[in-house]
Amino acid sequence: MWQGNLELIYTQKNLATQISHLYATAPLKVQRPFYPEGKNLCHTVILHTAGGIVGGDVLQQKIHLQAATNALITTASAGKVYQSNGQMAQQLIEIKIDDNAGLEWLPQETIIFNGAAFRQHLRVDLGENSSWLGWEITRFGRSARGEKFLAGEWHSNWEIWRSGQPLWLDRSFLLGGKMIEGFSGLNDSALIGTLVYIGQPVDRNLIEKVRDFSLEGEMGVTSTLGDGLLCRYRGNSSGEVRQWFQQVWQILRREMSDREAIIPRVWLSW
C-alpha cells in the first residue's frame, strides 16, 4: 500500500511561470516541465510509477498557483484502480489558484477495474480573475476485454470555490452491478466524462459551438454559476469523449485567451 504525496507551487519570475517548490514521494513523480506555448504557461506531467492504485492506497496532492501564473497539468498515462483487497483506495487533491492565475487540469482517463473501491476528492479555491478548466474521464471495467463493473464502488467529489462561495459542487457515487445498467446510472454504458470551466462569462453562442458535435454517446452542455461551462458525456468510446473535450478546450482557448491550444506531447501516444 502506498501513502504518496505531491506538493507543487508555481511562481512567476521574470514574466515566466516556474515550479518554485516540488515535493513528491513514491509512487508520485513529476517530469521536467515543458514550455511549448511560451515561458508563462508551464506544461507539467504527473506520473504514477507503481502503475496503478490498490485498496488501502492514499494519494494526496496539494497544488498552488501563485498570482499571475499559468499551468497545464496532465498525466503520463491512463490511471488504473485495481480490484480491492477489502480496503478503500483514496485520492485527495487540493488546488489553490491565486488572483489572475489559470490552471488547465487535463488528466488522462481513469479505468476502474471490476471489484475496485475508490474514493476521490478534488477541491479548487479560486482567487479574483483566476480561471479553471478541468476534466475527468472514467471507464468502469476493462470493457475492451469484455469486463463490466459488476462489483465494487466509486465515489467522486468535486468542489470549486471562489472567495468562500461555492461555484460547483458535484457528488457522484456508483455501485457495481445494477447501477451500471440502470438509466439513472450508466444506462449500460462503460464510460462517463465531466468537463468544467470557470472563468470569463460564457454566452449562448459559445454554448452552441460546444454543442455542435455529433457523438454516438450522450452529451449535455450548460452554463454554471461563476461564469462557467459544464459538459457531460455518457457512452462507450474513450476516443470520442477525448476528442470532444479537446475540441471544447480548443474553443475555450480561442474565445477566452485568443490563442490556440497546443496538445501536450505525452498525449501523442493515445
What function would you assign to each model-found segment?
Residues Q108-T110, W135-F140:
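Short, surface-exposed recognition loops or helix-turn segments adjacent to catalytic cores
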Residues I73, W132-W135:
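Short, hydrophobic/aromatic beta-strand segments
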Residues M1-E109, N114:
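N-terminal, charged/glycine-rich beta-strand/loop interface patches
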Residues M1-N5, I9-T25, L41, Q90, ...:
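N-terminal intrinsically disordered, cationic/polar leader segments
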Residues K29-R32, Y82-M88, G115-A117, S143-E147, ...:
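A short, polar/proline- and glycine-enriched secondary-structure boundary/capping micro-motif
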Residues T138-W270:
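A structural signal for small-residue-enriched, beta-sheet-centric alpha/beta enzyme cores
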